Amino acid sequence: MAVTKEQKASIVKKFGASEKDTGDVKVQIALLTEKINQLTNHCKDHPKDAGSRRGLISMVGHRRSLLKYYRRTDIEGYRTILKELNLRK
């Protein structure tokens, strides 16, 4: 259910400036999107798992605030990451 080290490393490599650039907004959004996708599948299989659903809603809210910040600071990068992650806005 959690993002493995290999998945995290590949996401950081794809979206970050370097392999250790985990603090960049793009990387944080991409990692949250991966976690959200995995938790969404988990919640579909286990509909009564309220704790996971609560965590999912929290992650979606955090990603939304990061996307708002990114839209304010770099509109072109924002549009690019929406296309790459297949997010709708």
UniProtKB/Swiss-Prot annotation:
Secreted as UniProt keyword: no
The UniProt record lists the keyword Chloroplast: no
GO CC terms of this entry: cytosolic small ribosomal subunit
Superkingdom of origin organism: Bacteria
Function (record text): One of the primary rRNA binding proteins, it binds directly to 16S rRNA where it helps nucleate assembly of the platform of the 30S subunit by binding and bridging several RNA helices of the 16S rRNA. Forms an intersubunit bridge (bridge B4) with the 23S rRNA of the 50S subunit in the ribosome.
Subunit structure: Part of the 30S ribosomal subunit. Forms a bridge to the 50S subunit in the 70S ribosome, contacting the 23S rRNA.
Family: Belongs to the universal ribosomal protein uS15 family.
Name of this chain's protein: Small ribosomal subunit protein uS15
Organism in which the protein naturally occurs: Treponema denticola (strain ATCC 35405 / DSM 14222 / CIP 103919 / JCM 8153 / KCTC 15104)
